[in-house]
Amino acid sequence: MIKKYSFVNHRIVLYLILGCVVVCGVWYSFDVRQAIDVGAVDLSLPQMSNNLLKEVAVGEGKTTNRLSRLPVDSTVPTVLPQSLAGSIAPPLPLDAYGHLARVSAVRDFFDYFLTAQNDLTPAALDEIVTHEIVKQLHGKSAQAEAQDVWTRYCAYFSQLVKLPDMGMVLGDKLDFVAVQRALDQRASLAVRTLGDWSEPFFGAEQQRQRYDLERLKIADDQALTDEQKKKRLVALEQKLPSKVQEERIKIQQQQDAVVKIIQLQKDEVTPDGIRLQVVGLLGPEVAYRVAEIRRQDEIWQEKYKHYAAQRAQRAQIEAQQLEPKEHDVQVENLRQRIFTKPGEALRAASLDQ
């Protein structure tokens, strides 16, 4: 019975997480950093510390070694690397006057190309980025602006790897002072290299990291009672911009929906019953999709019962005639005949174990 629910629950959880990101557009990641809420101040502190440490230690989470690890070579490729093949670069946004818009989407454009850092030399990467800038903005004032921002972004990376190791770990705990110093250094570096672009590029990340750090400090403060920690966490959250608070509420609703759906499935509520009970949390479209996933899982479960019955009958007949390897081949052939949709046979095999 546990296996029966674990697979469909996993699918629904993934669907809800993706829906949360797409529909809500949240910047605050759906991860263990949010495990510490105002009702559970003692949860996941080691994991939270590790996550924040990784982000700070690698430099804004995803950028430290992007350029520093590239081999020194001037070869420029004539085609896109495999990591970018078949994809399209994000558009560079413009404001109403034709200038490059000061928004985070500009960083997204450059980060798209930086995903191929391990496949390109610095010269090749620069050539590809420049080519795409010209392709999108040829003849516009934003062309030179985009090229200047790219140069600044590269300068940020080259200086980032030169920052000293701050020794942010003391034993098995974070050194909060060192982490704060590291965040301050990165913020200062961003301003020096990117100027006014530091805010649209790193503002949201820096705000989230500092917020996470303050939550960690509160959760780790042994002088505070659980009730005092809850109050301080509430006060800290109230300092967030209203938009961020709204997004956090949406994320919490998603988490509540996941818990509710898992319980409804354990109670063997029908797909339509699930849809009616979660539509208020998820909206009609997502609730319908969750119910459909449940409905398809019920169909699969019936198919698996039919398969298991046939497998058991054959096992009794063939037990005295086939070697173990031959028996396994027969079972695999039976799976392939009954489970025709992608992934079904593999799922059946996992339940056979």
Swiss-Prot record:
SUPFAM superfamilies: Lipase chaperone-like (SSF158855). Keywords: Cell inner membrane, Cell membrane, Chaperone, Lipid degradation, Lipid metabolism, Membrane, Transmembrane, Transmembrane helix. It is a single-pass membrane protein. It is found in: Cell inner membrane. GO terms for molecular function: unfolded protein binding. The chain crosses the membrane at residues 12-32. GO terms for biological process: lipid catabolic process; protein folding. It holds the Pfam family Lipase_chap. One of its GO terms (cellular component) is plasma membrane. This is Lipase chaperone. Its main location: membrane. Belongs to the lipase chaperone family. It comes from the Bacteria. The keyword Chloroplast does not apply. The lineage of its organism: Bacteria, Pseudomonadati, Pseudomonadota, Gammaproteobacteria, Lysobacterales. May be involved in the folding of the extracellular lipase during its passage through the periplasm.
